[in-house]
Amino acid sequence: MSEYLLLLVGTVLVNNFVLVKFLGLCPFMGVSSKLESAIGMSMATTFVLTLASILSYLVDTYLLTPFDLSYLRTMAFILVIAVVVQFTEMLVQKTSAALHRALGIYLPLITTNCAVLGVALLNVNEKHDFIESAIYGFGAAVGFSIVLILFSAMRERLAAADVPAPFKGGAIAMITAGLMSLAFMGFTGLVN
């Protein structure tokens, strides 16, 4: 039980996919200008990452490995992710049309979010079992969500702040992301 908790904490805080592994930077920078859309994107990404991790594990364990088709792993995982994203898009469209409009193009772009594919591939490379794969996917999603929501809240405050002209827009966003990354480095000694 404690190894599962360590895996979760390590994935969320210590080995954060955005700030440490630099995966998922496109939605991190693209959707983080408004807190409302960042929260919606976080929920959608959490659902997709967790479900894609579980399904990718099942596809790899029960289809690719037994038939010695590991060379198709990346394509199979991309197909699984695309199916999960389509399902998520239909679910979001049915439950919240406003959120679907707010997320716009970013919802289908979860398919190309390298964090989702990265989690699926790292699950296989680190030889996680079913429960560890689910925890790893959920932890990566929670870490992504925390960083995205914190960053969007800071960007909303920066939009109202008196920022010098050369630093407006993307420049101050990158500086803020760097400072956030430094803050998360404080968690490095938390999990061995």
UniProtKB/Swiss-Prot annotation:
GO cellular component, as recorded: plasma membrane
InterPro entries tied to this protein: Ion_transpt_RnfA/RsxA, NqrDE/RnfAE, NqrDE/RnfAE_oxidrdctase
Subcellular location: Cell inner membrane
Its membrane topology: Multi-pass membrane protein
Annotated transmembrane regions: 5-25, 39-59, 72-92, 102-122, 134-154, 171-191
Pfam families in UniProt: Rnf-Nqr (PF02508)
Entry superkingdom: Bacteria
Keywords for this protein: Cell inner membrane, Cell membrane, Electron transport, Membrane, Translocase, Transmembrane, Transmembrane helix, Transport
GO biological process, one term: electron transport chain
Enzyme class: translocase
Main location: membrane
Function: Part of a membrane-bound complex that couples electron transfer with translocation of ions across the membrane.
Subunit structure: The complex is composed of six subunits: RnfA, RnfB, RnfC, RnfD, RnfE and RnfG.
Name of the protein described by the UniProt record: Ion-translocating oxidoreductase complex subunit A
Organism per entry: Shewanella loihica (strain ATCC BAA-1088 / PV-4)
